[in-house]
Amino acid sequence: MQTLVDEETGPFISDAIHYGLMRYKNEFGHRDLGYPFLDLYSEYSQREVGMMANYRNTHSSFRGSTLQNELGGAHYFLFIDLHKDEDIEESINYKDKFVNQKQFQWESPNSTKVDSDRGRDLAQNKVNGKTIHLFVRKYKTVNNVTQRYTYIGRANAISYRNEKPIEIQYQLENKMPIDLYQEFEPEKLVF
């Protein structure tokens, strides 16, 4: 506490706090992003999302495709790699893709059954009061550098099929900008 009132270091600390607040205001403005404080189409790591969602375990423990918020379990965070490694096993080569700017097809992990609690939450999220957040990246790594995920926003299941894995069609709450859509799905022409 003495450092905060110290005549030499106090002004430096005050300047650093002021700078941080001004930088935040310039980047995000005064808008309320709402829980879990995610900015649409911004990039995040799984660790950052875990911290913003108040995930209680160590942030390396939720590696994989889903992270369920522990505070009431009302939010699911899906982390998706669109392009898998060429040597990936067929059993985990999920058929995840953007159908169009408003729809995404996602396959659950092989361990998720349609009649399990998690399966029902993912395939019937609105009925079960669950919120689905989609995070997508083209590749896991580029030049040995782990890539960040782009937050696509909230999504709601509109249909599902198969017992295990479950293929779910999600309707995006926000239509993706055309440039971002074509970055993720360059082979699909949009007129």
Regions found by a protein language model. Give the residues of each.
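Detector for methionine-enriched segments
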Residues: M1, M22, M51-M52, I88, ...
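C-terminal helical accessory/scaffold domains
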Residues: M1-F37
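Generic hydrophobic, helix-prone segments enriched in Leu/Val/Ile
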Residues: I13-K25, L78, W106, L122, ...
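Acidic, glycine-rich low-complexity segments with interspersed aromatic residues
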Residues: Y35-R148
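Compact mixed alphabeta submodule
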Residues: T141-F191
